Amino acid sequence: MLNKLQQKWNVSSRKLFLILCTFAITGTSTAYVSRSITAWVGFNETTFWLWAFLLRLSILIFGYQIILLIVAFVFGQFKFFWNYEKKILRRMGVLPYEQIKLAIFASGKGSNAENIIQYIENHKNTHVKLIISSRPNTGVLDIAARYGIEAIVLDKKRFDETPEYIEILKSQGITHIVLAGFLLKVPQQLTAAYPNRIINIHPALLPSYGGKGMYGEKVHQAVIEAGDKESGITIHDVDDHYDNGKIIFQKKIEVLPTDTAGSLAEKIHLLEHKYYPSVIKKWVRR
């Protein structure tokens, strides 16, 4: 259970310990404050039960949140718990949701990119603001033009060696980056500028069949040649290495004896279209 919490919150063991201590001390402190205030206002066994219940409920709803932030500050976890509180307030409708602005990075035809754009169109707080292609004259640039989305063609050397594209992303207010068939390695300066805010989809079950040069039909051919009984998709956070970030979602399919690299590619493509947009929707709100 603790391992699952650590993975869900993406924190170190030490930070997880401090977070759990914060929750525990907050619960104990809230109970103490509730009893103290109840005694201070003079509530006892003869008090109408509803008044006592409403007072304690108010302390639980409002006092708990304040105490939680105070204890979190003491333990050096204020940022984590303030984000936690904001999520609760957004779900309650007290705070508006952050406006999510996506940049999609792609290298080819752009079918995944178009699928994401169509899905995102129905969500008022999320928008695709920018398409970045690693190649000129690609299908994804035509898609950008069709949907009226600004598009840029990367210069690989400048992408690897300068902060130019980070400045472009920031000037557009981009909050998250989605890789959709993007074949270049993401440079360290970009992952540092968008920590845990870059997502990728890989056409295999990582950690198998990942790494430099493993993309498209090369992956499916390797799966067929290995005689694997199953394959699938992996959606993961992006770090400084190829196909190495934290796994967010995986979906498996059976590889039939009659499958070829081409037929397997078609199956995997259907999985990508079915799951990638909905996973992105959850990912941007985590």
What are these regions (language model features)?
Residues 86-98:
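Membrane-cytosol interface motif
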Residues 16, 20-28, 32, 57-65, ...:
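Alpha-helical transmembrane spans of integral membrane proteins, capturing the lipid-embedded, hydrophobic core
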Residues 30-42, 67-75:
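Membrane-water interface at transmembrane helix exits
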Residues 96-286:
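One-carbon transfer enzymes
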Residues 70-89:
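Juxtamembrane/interfacial segments flanking transmembrane helices
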Residues 15-19, 49-57, 176:
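Residue-level signature of transmembrane alpha-helical entry/exit and packing/kink sites
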Residues 7, 38-52, 91-94:
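Membrane interface segments of multi-pass transport proteins and intramembrane proteases
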Residues 1-9:
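Short, Lys/Arg-rich, polar N-terminal cytosolic tail immediately upstream
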